[in-house]
Structure formats: structure tokens, C-alpha cells
Amino acid sequence: MAWPCITRACCIARFWNQLDKADIAVPLVFTKYSEATEQPLPAQIPRSAAAPIDTQPGGDARAAGGGDAAPGPARPGTAPHGSPPADSVMRHDYKPWKVQRPEPSCKPKSEYQPSDTPFEKETQYQKDFRAWPIPKRGDHPWIPKAGPSPVLGPERGSPEKAAQEKRRKKEEEAEADEEHPKAARPGDAREKGRQRGDEAGGQEGRGRAAADALNRQIKEEVVAAGVSSSYRNEFRPWIDVKPVKAIKAKAQYKPPEEKMTHETSYSAQFKGETSKPAPADNKFLERRRIRTLYSEPYKEPPKVEKPSVKPSKPKKTTTSHKPLKKAKDKQIASGRAAKKKSAETSNTAKPEDKEKSKEMNNKLAEAKE
């Protein structure tokens, strides 16, 4: 067992004899497992050296002379009372490991071994795709230009081309054909006679001819080498292959020609109870309908015509006094109208009535006094 639970009382009480006491102790306390299992005797008996397995290098000396350790000279860190070193947990009682001969490592040495042949400075990509010469500003070789003299235009680049080919082939290889220098000789004479025409024509034709000559030279170098680029060798276009005809996939869903009914199978199978006719012969259902207060779900209750009497609405008691104000305004308006009418009637009354009314008023005033 490895590190049992020794904090609970149940684990301490149960199977105590079956536990390995060396697992419970701190690992560095015991140098041998036999010291944990065997109980120390009062008289130290010399143990056999082959039985235990030492965990520290200094265990052989202690195992061989276990009984003689006490009378011998004590170690320079042990207690003065001469306790055996097996009981000590001090650091100086355990000698460190001393490895005199280290084992040879199986890991290979990572030493740089230079190759016999030097590396190429130019990569395959640089070989296949070389830089084109930069033409003059505004001179695009892919745009055909109409020269000043259309008759002498195509012949203008031939002497310069021949001269450049001659120089290149002299520098590169001596195995060039003899036709090139022969073709170059009449070109030299033409050049001398044509220099005067070039001066009049301008310098545009010269730059154009030089760019064309360089482009042809690069193309000829590639063809003369006989080796196209590795990318062209690996990825070549298909020849004599007909283009594939586009295939239109058939539609998997075919819509029905006739008109679709928007009724699902669920709605067709489970319809409402209103469509079921009520059985008229069943007296039990009629009695039950009379007894119960509820009407059947598939029978509509008979509609009773209610008398059309409008219930009197209770007056709303609101905090706002708008309806009262309206009533007061109506009363004031009616009073004003009555006064106006009385004034109009009084104006039309006779002056005799006015005098009578004055007399009556005077009599009343005298009576009050």
C-alpha cells in the first residue's frame, strides 16, 4: 500500500497490522526497509550484508560493520553519546553520491560536418526565372511601335543583333557555328551605311532595337541550353484534350402538376368535434346533458335574445371638475339669454308702465323706512 489514510480513526483502527509501516514514515528517515519492519533489539546483532538493499552509498559500510559502529570513532557530525547513524536524520550523516566514471551517453554529438562540395549560390528558382533587362522609361517591348521608315524598320535590329550574338558566342563557347560570323560580315557594312539614317531617325529606334535584341538573346539562351525550367517539365499542359461538357444535374424534386391541397394528414385525420352529429336516440346522453351544468363541446347552446335595455352607467367621480364647469356654463349662458330677452321686452314696453313701476318702487322704499 502506498500512503494510506492515517488521519481517520477508522483507518487507524482497521487492518493496522496489514499496513506497511515504512510507507507511513517519512521516506528519508530510514536508509533500509528492514529498519522499518524489524523492531530494534536491546543488543545490536550484526546483520547480513546481502539481505537489505541500500538506498544510500554509505549504507555498505554501515551494513558491514553495524555492530562495530558504536565503539569505533564517531563521525564528525554525530551526537557525543554515540548513537548509531541509522537513527540520525541529519544531512551530514548521509554522504552524497560520488560518480567517478560517468556512463557514456548514447546521444550523438551535434557537430557540424561540412560537405565536400560547396553549395550552389544560385537556386533552381533563380536559374529558371532570371530577371529580364529593364528597358528605358516609356519603352515597352510588347507594344509594337511604328518606326519612322517602315521599309528599314525590320532590318534595323539585325546588325546589332548579329554583333551581340558574335560577342556572346566568343565569350561563352568556341563551338559556335561558322554561319554567325559570316552573317555578321555583311551586317557590318550595312551598319556603316545605315548610321547616317539612324542619326536622322532619332534615338527611339535604337532603344527599341536594343530591348528586342536582349529579349531575343535571353530566349535563344534558354533554347540553346535545351533545358526548360523544372516547373515547365513537371507541369505541362494537356494536348489534344477536348473540353468537358457541362452536365446539368437533374432536379430531384419534381413539383406536382395538379393543384396542391394545403391540408395536412394531421388536419385531415383529426377534425374538430363540430363535424360529428349528435346522436338523437341516446337518452342517456340527453339525461346527462340535463343533469350537468356544462354543455356538450359539439353542441352550441341556444342563444337567448336579451332585451335591449341599456344599463345606466354610473357617474364617474373624477378629480377633474370639467363636467360641473360645463353645467355651470350652460346655466350662466341661459341666464344671460333671459336677461337679454327681458331687456329687449322692457325697451319695447310703454313709458306708462315705466312710470307705474317707479311709483311702486318709491312706495316700497317709503314702507321700508
From Swiss-Prot:
GO CC terms for this protein?
A: axon; cis-Golgi network; dendrite; Golgi-associated vesicle; microtubule
Q: Which domain of life is it from?
A: Eukaryota
Chain segments carrying region Mn 1: 87-110
Name the InterPro entries on file.
Answer: MAP6
Per the record, which residues fall in region Disordered? 41-213, 251-369
- Record GO terms (molecular function): calmodulin binding; microtubule binding
Which terms are listed as keywords in the entry?
Answer: Cytoplasm, Cytoskeleton, Microtubule, Transport
Q: Where is the composition biased (Basic residues)?
A: 312-328
Ranges for the region named Mn 3 are 228-251
> Which segments show compositional bias classed as Basic and acidic residues?
89-110, 118-142, 179-209, 297-308, 350-369
Q: Where in the cell is it found?
A: Cytoplasm, Cytoskeleton
Principal localization? cytoplasm
Composition bias of kind Low complexity appears in: 70-80
Described function? Involved in microtubule stabilization in many cell types, including neuronal cells. Specifically has microtubule cold stabilizing activity. Involved in dendrite morphogenesis and maintenance by regulating lysosomal trafficking.
The protein depicted here goes by the name Microtubule-associated protein 6 homolog
User: What is the native source organism of this protein?
Assistant: Gallus gallus
